């Protein structure tokens, strides 16, 4: 039998699902469990993954939010079967290294996306490299968003970026209010 911990959002629907699961399973703390059931929406799942990013655990999401791109439907009758039949997906964090015009370097880690935004009323002038390859020579916009497949249905979708399959090995690079090149959607 799997050793389970349940983490849920605070909304009523999540709490109701949690109470059903707690009545069916003996739950453990994070250290003793080997699977963590996360009840909420995609945002809550991403928060939970980020908060627990150093754990080598399996996370199983149950949707009590809206879209549920990262989550599974809840069925109290089939929960054990659903857990055993679930497809495993590895979500790798995105590392962004940024160097500004004063050569200050910062590193960021994200599960869903990273964004670079203008800091004043003036548009940002950006170039985008992937390793040594220049992808975009000059982008004039309010900023740019680099999204992983896990984040492609959030902010990325709002800026007209593509939805990526969760198993995709791609990243979405989407401009935020681009001025040049015009009509580029990512």
Identify what each model region corresponds to.
Residues 37, 63, 114:
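A residue-level signal for conserved active-site and pocket-lining positions in enzyme catalytic cores
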Residues 145-182:
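Gly/Ser/Thr-rich active-site loops/lids in small-molecule metabolic enzymes
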Residues 28-31, 88, 107-108, 118-121, ...:
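Solvent-exposed alpha-helices and their adjacent loops that cap or buttress functional pockets
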Residues 55-71:
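Short, acidic/small-residue loops that bind anionic groups at enzyme active sites
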Residues 41-44, 65-67, 150-153:
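Short glycine-rich anion-binding loops that position phosphate/pyrophosphate groups of nucleotides
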Residues 36, 59, 144-145:
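Short, well-ordered beta-strand core segments
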Residues 67-143:
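Catalytic core of DAGKc-family lipid kinases
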Residues 1-35, 39, 44-55, 74-90, ...:
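ATP/NTP phosphate-donor binding region
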């Amino acid at each position: 039998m799997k050793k389970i911990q349940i983490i849920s959002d605070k909304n009523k629907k999540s709490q109701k699902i949690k109470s059903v699961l707690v009545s069916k399973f003996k739950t453990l703390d994070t250290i003793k469990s080997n699977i963590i059931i996360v009840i909420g929406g995609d945002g809550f799942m991403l928060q939970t993954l980020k908060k627990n990013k150093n754990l080598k655990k399996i996370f199983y999401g149950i949707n009590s939010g809206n879209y549920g791109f990262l989550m599974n439907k809840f069925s109290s009758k089939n929960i054990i079967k659903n857990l055993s039949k679930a497809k495993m997906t590895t979500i790798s964090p995105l590392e962004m290294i940024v160097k500004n015009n004063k050569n200050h370097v910062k590193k960021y880690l994200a599960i869903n996306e990273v964004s670079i935004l203008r800091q004043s009323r003036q548009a940002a002038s950006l170039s985008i490299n992937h390793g040594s390859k220049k992808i975009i020579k000059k982008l004039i916009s309010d900023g740019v968003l680099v999204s992983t497949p896990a984040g492609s249905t959030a902010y990325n979708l709002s800026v007209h970026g593509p939805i990526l399959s969760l198993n995709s090995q791609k990243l979405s690079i989407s401009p935020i209010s681009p001025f040049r090149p015009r009509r580029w959607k990512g």
